Amino acid sequence: MKVHVYTDIETLFGRACRVWMDTLLDAGHDIEFIDLGTNTDAPLPNVGQADVNVLVAGIYALPRFAKHGLPRHGRHVLWMFDPLTKNEASVHRHKASLFDALAPHLHAVMAMDASIERYVAQHFPALAVFWLPYLVAGKHVRAPLLETQRNRGIVMLGGDTPRRREAEKRFLASPSPLNAEFIWSGLWGAARDACRAGSRISLSIHADAEHTYFDQFRAFETWALGTAVVSDHFEGWESFGIEPGLHLAMASPQDMPQVCAELLADVPRREAMVQASQQLLREKFSPAAWQGRMLSMIESVA
């Protein structure tokens, strides 16, 4: 089978693409990777025929597909990591509009969580939907840095929103001095990995309070690099095998400075959290654990 794997942000979704490429190559399929880049206006490249197109698409590829259509050949499967909501008060609402324009032309969706499964079932009941969370290859799960090797305290990597700005103000106003960095943009690839690996705590804060979800990409990549996560509250952690307090600390933004201060002072606890979270990645979220299901998904669509 000939499979094309597309993405738009290689420095963000590149590892997710390689998970698919390695899995399909190991099964004897013919694979080609197409990096669309971040241009939302250019026509799609002419890369020839394929039986299946796996689209690991974000905010650049979705409008490009909506404008120029999907690849001309093959059947189309979208691996959806962005949250979907029609709530007009949420900063995520535009992603649903982009998805809705694309959905009638898809043959299947791989949903990162149950909320996306429900969205597709409600609005596009004829569209096949599978659950496939973000996966991390074992070769990307690194030994954690020693405490003395870490060069950052608390780090938040993500888009700038009013809710996150409020969280930043709370850290700045904390009675105990906390070395917290809120980095809104400009850090990708190896530099992003180094930042996460060198930090003692990585924050995961919802962009808004209207649509909350488990940010797998942020948490799993951070765990793989050996750093503890303090997360905003989210539902559905049980379905991922996550135990708050064991794999991550969970707190509301107003409580995060205190939770982080306590965690910074407790190196053994942070080390235990990293060990538990990396074990969870290896057991539940490695490509090896999902290989059979991944191949079955592709074969059912082809």
Stretches found by the model and what they are:
Residues M1-A50, A57-H68, L78-F240:
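Nucleotide-sugar donor-binding catalytic core of glycosyltransferases
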Residues T222, L248, S277:
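Hydrophobic, well-ordered secondary-structure elements that form the walls
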Residues I242-Q254, E262-V267:
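Conserved acidic donor-binding segment of nucleotide-sugar-dependent glycosyltransferases
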